[in-house]
Amino acid sequence: MKRMLVFGLLLGLLCIPLSVNAFELGVRGYYWLPELDGEVKVDESGITGTTIDFGDDLGMDDEEYPIVEAFVGLGDHHISVSAMQVDYSGSKTLSTNIIFKGETFTTDVASSLKYDMIDAEYQYDLIDLENILAGFSIGVIGKVKWVDGEVEIKSAIETAKETFTAPIPMVGAGVHVGLIADLLEVRVKGTGIGYSGNMLYDVMGDISLTPFPLVDIHGGYRIIHLDVDVDDVELKYDMSGPYVAVTVGF
């Protein structure tokens, strides 16, 4: 599949041999518990769609998702690639008719929201005081978020599906603060983009403990916000919630 090929190529970049002075190399696994809040509206052939709430109208519930990240760094340069698969589903007896992509639904419906998200990120540290006291750094971030998925609604007699695929460039900043040298650290980073009334941002922050060498344990919070109106599709979408993570680095 195209999205898996993209992920494989990006991971391949991380395997390019670096000099012995490589600053970091490792993997990080997250377990994220986000709340879902969003709505979608899809027009078709001049037929105006209904603004449909994922939870209230379609019965989608919150889910929990693993995220896998690989990272490498050399001096002030840091590269990471992460991947997540999202799969929401729900069923609902409609209290009023809804129109989605030109189709009218009047009774019981089943729905799904599925997508793969791959983040390829580069950070350059403008300020790096990692060798002073407990450590402190500030960096600028450039990121491409690749999203590939679909929204589907179906009843006993009708089915309608809208697919979406997009590489989204984003910029932002990251801050790292060491509280206790080699033991306790805080990390905050955020990226985003806004244009023509559309907006996307991805913000996360955590505190990590290093119980023994090469292993960090994290607890944090992440927010992904999307608000776009492109062609015949309007999508407002928020995922936000706490996460835990484990890093193994060298």
Please annotate each region the language model reported.
Residues V20-F23, I127-S137, I180-L184, L214:
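Short loop/turn motifs that connect adjacent beta-strands in outer-membrane beta-barrel proteins
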Residues E35-E63, Q85-M117, V147-A166, Y195, ...:
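Extracellular/periplasm-exposed beta-strand and loop segments of Gram-negative cell-envelope proteins
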Residues L183-N198, I223:
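Transmembrane beta-strand segments that form the barrel wall of outer-membrane beta-barrel proteins
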Residues I132, T165-P167, T191-D202:
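Solvent-exposed loop/turn segments connecting transmembrane beta-strands
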Residues V27-G29, A70, I79-V81, Y122, ...:
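Membrane-embedded beta-strand positions of outer-membrane beta-barrel proteins
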Residues E24, D119-A120, L209, D238-F250:
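Outer-membrane beta-barrel "beta-signal"
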Residues D57-G90, V109-F136, K189, F250:
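Outer-membrane beta-barrel transmembrane strands
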Residues Y31, V72-L74, Y124-L126, V144, ...:
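Residue-level signature of outer-membrane beta-barrel architecture
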